[in-house]
């Protein structure tokens, strides 16, 4: 699989989001998903301390075992873990890092990310503590998530990566965040690349939403509107006319962005992992991209 850069780290073009571990799938199934990812050439595993209150990190650490040196472990801190554990104050993040290291069963974190901005803590204080962790060898690179372009600028180029929501149906980062990443040579990691399942191909115009699916959830009617489903049909036709699938279009469109280092996608089965791992290989041309924009208009 193609490799790209996050600072000094070489990462696979598709990364495995570990948010389902413990919440939607148990440890045995999580291990099967991890094994399938490694077999498919994925080396970036993205988790967070709040994913099932630390169980995601624990499952990942135990599954990797002696394979730890082969892969890039990315985790996050800062979202509310409980009433006392949250935010980006130096004293808290130091403890959060130690807790993540223990749960992951490792002595270093490849990419340590601030999960969201903390308005109560000056970013300079947070960055100072993160730099201490780097100097101590406990963290190799630092990143952020859910940051605006202004907040990225305020960090003064200290972050190696930015992880925000981005897909064909959520293009807000294009206005300011992606250009800022380009200016500062910061890697961008899109999450929710399949727009909450809308770009999987499971949801079709004129067909009922599958029971128990994301489309059947409370926010389904808005996301899975007739307008969006019509766009999905146009995208499917575009992909199939060129011998590809909607899934491949969703991943490859993101991979065509120069600042994108790895597309972070969750999975609950080995089959999903294998499909995601091969989905970013379609080389979209300079003629394809504006045509896709027209389809989404």
Describe the role of every protein-language-model region.
Residues 25-37, 88-104, 148, 152-153:
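Short, acidic/polar
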């Amino acid at each position: 699989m193609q490799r790209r850069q996050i600072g000094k780290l070489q990462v696979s073009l598709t990364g495995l989001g570990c948010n389902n571990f413990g919440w939607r799938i148990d440890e045995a199934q999580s291990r099967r998903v991890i094994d399938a990812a490694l077999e498919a050439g994925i080396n970036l595993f993205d988790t967070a301390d709040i994913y099932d209150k630390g169980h995601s990190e624990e499952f990942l650490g135990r599954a990797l075992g002696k394979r730890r040196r082969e892969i890039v472990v990315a985790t996050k801190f800062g979202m509310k873990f409980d009433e006392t554990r949250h935010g980006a104050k130096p004293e808290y993040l130091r403890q959060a890092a130690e807790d993540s290291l223990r749960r992951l069963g490792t002595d270093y974190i490849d990419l340590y990310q601030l999960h969201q901005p903390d308005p109560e803590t000056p970013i300079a204080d947070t960055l100072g503590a993160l730099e201490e962790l780097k100097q101590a060898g406990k963290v190799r690179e630092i990143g952020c998530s859910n940051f605006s372009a202004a907040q990225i600028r305020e960090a003064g180029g200290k972050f190696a990566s930015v992880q925000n929501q981005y897909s064909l149906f959520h293009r807000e980062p294009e206005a300011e965040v992606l250009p800022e990443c380009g200016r500062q040579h910061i890697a961008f990691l899109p999450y929710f690349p399949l727009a909450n399942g809308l770009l999987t191909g499971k949801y079709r115009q004129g067909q009922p939403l599958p029971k128990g699916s994301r489309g059947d959830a409370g926010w389904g009617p808005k996301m899975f509107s007739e307008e969006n489903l019509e766009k999905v049909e146009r995208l499917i036709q575009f992909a199939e006319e060129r011998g590809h699938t909607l899934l491949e279009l969703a991943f490859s469109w993101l991979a065509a962005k120069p600042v994108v280092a790895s597309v972070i996608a969750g999975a609950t089965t080995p089959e999903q992992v294998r499909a995601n791992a091969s989905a970013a290989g379609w080389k979209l041309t300079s003629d394809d991209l504006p045509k896709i924009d027209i389809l989404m208009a």
